[in-house]
Amino acid sequence: MTNHDLASLSQTIETAFENRDAVNTGTRGAVRDAVEAALNLLDSGKVRVAERAADGTWTVNQWLKKAVLLSFRLNPMELVRGGPGEAVWWDKVASKFDGWSVNEFEKAGFRAVPNCVVRRSAYIAPNAVLMPSFVNLGAYVGEGTMVDTWATVGSCAQIGKNVHLSGGVGIGGVLEPMQAGPTIIEDNCFIGARSEVVEGCIVREGSVLGMGVFIGKSTKIVDRATGEVMYGEVPPYSVVVAGSMPSGSAMGNGQPAPNLYCAVIVKRVDEKTRSKTGINELLRD
C-alpha cells in the first residue's frame, strides 16, 4: 500500500471517528472498508500503532488506534467457538487464528502454545513464542520475543524483538482507560515475573526489570547512583528493582509517614555487558 493510499485511509477513519455516534453495526461502504483495511494492515505487521525513529523518538499513529475503537461500533457480538468441550465465548473481536490451518502457521513462523489468546489485529513476528498468555488487539510483538505464561500484552502495546516477558507480566493497553500513547518495551529487554508497565510508559532497549516492579506515569524512577528522579521512561540498559523512598512528611500523630513505592535503577550496563551477563547476575547487588 502506497503512502497516498495510507493517507486516504487515515483520512476516512479520522472523519468517521469525528462522527462516531453515527457509526454502528449497520454501517457499510467506505467507513467499514477503511476500518477493515486498517485492522488487516495491523494484523499483518505492515503498519504499527507506534513507530520508532532513528533518534529513538516514538511517533503514534493515532488514526490506527481510532480504527481499532471504531471496530467495536461496527462489529456485533457473536459466538466465538473453539473452547474445550465445545465451549464458546461471546465477543466482538475474532481470534487472530480464526480459520487458520497449518499453512498460515508455517508462514507466520511463530509458536502458539495451546491456550494462548491473540485477538485479531495483533501482530506476532516470526520466532516469537506465545505461552498460555493474552495478546490484545492492535498490539505488536517483535521477532524472537517470549510471552511467558499468564503474561498480558495490552491493546496497541509495542513489544520489541528478543524481549522476555516473564510469567504474569502485565503490559498496559491504551483503549480503556484511553491513553495518548501505547506502552512500549524496546528491543532486548527482560521484564521480571509479575511486573507491570502501564499508562504509555517506555522501557528503553536492553533494560532489565526485576520481579514485581510496577511502573506507571506517576511512579518515581530513581537512579541510585545520581539521585535523579524521572517519570514515564526507563533509560536504556538500566537494571531496575522495586524500592521505596521516604515520604518526607509526618502523619497527624507526629510519627514519620510511611515510605512510598518507587522503582530503583540499581545500575546501568553497556550493550556489551548486557549481552554477556546473565539476568540473575545483573540483579545481584
From Swiss-Prot:
UniProt-listed Enzyme Commission number(s): 2.3.1.117
InterPro entries in the record: DapD_Trfase_Hexpep_rpt_fam, Hexapep, Hexapep_transf_CS, THP_succinylTrfase_dom1, THP_succinylTrfase_N_sf, Trimer_LpxA-like_sf
Gene Ontology MF terms: 2,3,4,5-tetrahydropyridine-2,6-dicarboxylate N-succinyltransferase activity; nucleotidyltransferase activity
Top-level class of the enzyme under EC nomenclature: transferase
Keywords: Acyltransferase, Amino-acid biosynthesis, Cytoplasm, Diaminopimelate biosynthesis, Lysine biosynthesis, Repeat, Transferase
Entry similarity comment: Belongs to the transferase hexapeptide repeat family.
Protein name: 2,3,4,5-tetrahydropyridine-2,6-dicarboxylate N-succinyltransferase
